[in-house]
Design a protein with these regions (language model features):
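Sec-dependent signal peptide cleavage junction
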Residues: 21-33
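Bacterial N-terminal signal peptides
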Residues: 12-23
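Structural signature of tandem-repeat unit edges
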Residues: 37-45, 54-71, 82-95, 104-118, ...
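N-terminal secretory signal peptides that target proteins for export/translocation
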Residues: 1-7
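Consensus positions within tandem repeat domains that build extended binding/scaffold surfaces
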Residues: 74-77, 97-100, 120-123, 143-146, ...
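Extracellular, surface-exposed repeat architectures
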Residues: 51-53, 168-170
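Short, flexible turn/loop "capping" segments at secondary-structure junctions
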Residues: 52-53, 125, 148, 193, ...
């Protein structure tokens, strides 16, 4: 009899657990709201955009939904949208997920929120028609693959960016000029790999590291001035480029093998560094 009662109690507890589980799922689902093509949530008096299914081509994302400020956009919220041509994001946004606009193939221009300090992982990856994006003075970091494959992007001015991540501009085949400013320190691995039209790069005083394969395959790159603060030149960082003349400053104490491998146009190289590694 005791065993039967114990079994019955277990069944009751299991049933209660299942009911609780379904209640939690239902409660979570009930937190979604829908307005003008936006799916969003509300929490602590603030709105987060989960996704957008509208058909607008020129989109101004609202700063307020359901009377609450829009402060966040979740990962992939606009990804693979073939309709979008231009987007204005409100400056109320303080956080974004990854791949928010990835593979938006017809996106040409974007106003990026002033309140963000970075461009997140794969935010614009595969946006083949993107030609215009504002990089405000608040942006300090460009994360990995943020603009990878943006084949129509031609020019970049990065006023306060301190570092760029791996593959951040890889395969941007129309990119011809990039300007960095005071405070910049780090060029990530393969960040400009196969930017075949890149001709002009300005690396300011303060730049310390050019990482692996950073400019590999930049066939049009003929000249680059290395700042006197440069310390690390990583392997293959200028492999297969069009460099003609280089001067490596005394500040370079860590230069790895194959930095200038297959630079077939290289006519003159002056090396003043102190240590060669690898």
């Amino acid at each position: 009899m005791k065993n039967k009662n114990t079994g019955f109690k277990h069944l009751v507890l299991l049933f209660a657990f299942i009911l609780c589980l379904f209640s939690c799922v239902s409660a979570k689902a009930a937190n979604y709201y829908y307005e003008d093509g936006y799916k969003y949530t509300l929490s602590l008096g603030k709105a987060t955009i989960i996704s957008y299914v509208g058909s607008d081509t020129d989109l101004t994302v609202p700063s307020i939904l359901n009377g609450k400020p829009v402060v966040k956009i979740e990962s992939s919220a606009f990804a693979n949208n073939k309709n979008l041509c231009s987007v204005i994001l409100p400056d109320t946004i303080t956080s974004m997920g990854i791949s928010v606009f990835a593979q938006c193939e017809n996106l040409k221009s974007i106003h990026y929120p002033e309140g963000l300090d970075r461009i997140y992982y794969r935010t614009f990856a595969g946006c083949h028609n993107l030609t215009k994006v504002n990089i405000s003075s608040n942006i300090k970091i460009i994360e990995d693959s943020a603009f990878a494959g943006c084949t129509s992007l031609t020019y970049l001015d990065l006023p306060k960016v301190k570092e760029i991540g791996e593959y951040s501009f890889a395969n941007c085949t129309s990119l011809s000029e990039v300007i960095f400013h005071k405070g910049f320190t780090y060029v990530g691995s393969a960040s400009f790999k196969n930017c075949t039209n890149l001709k002009d790069v300005t690396l300011p005083l303060g730049t310390q590291t050019i990482s692996y394969s950073a400019f590999e395959g930049c066939k049009a790159l003929r000249h680059i001035d290395f700042p006197s603060t440069l310390v690390f030149l990583k392997s293959a960082s200028f492999k297969d480029t069009g460099l003609v003349h280089i001067i490596v400053p005394p500040s370079v104490t860590h230069e790895e093998q194959s930095v200038f491998l297959n630079c077939k146009n290289l006519e003159e190289a002056e090396y003043h560094g102190k240590v060669i590694e690898g």
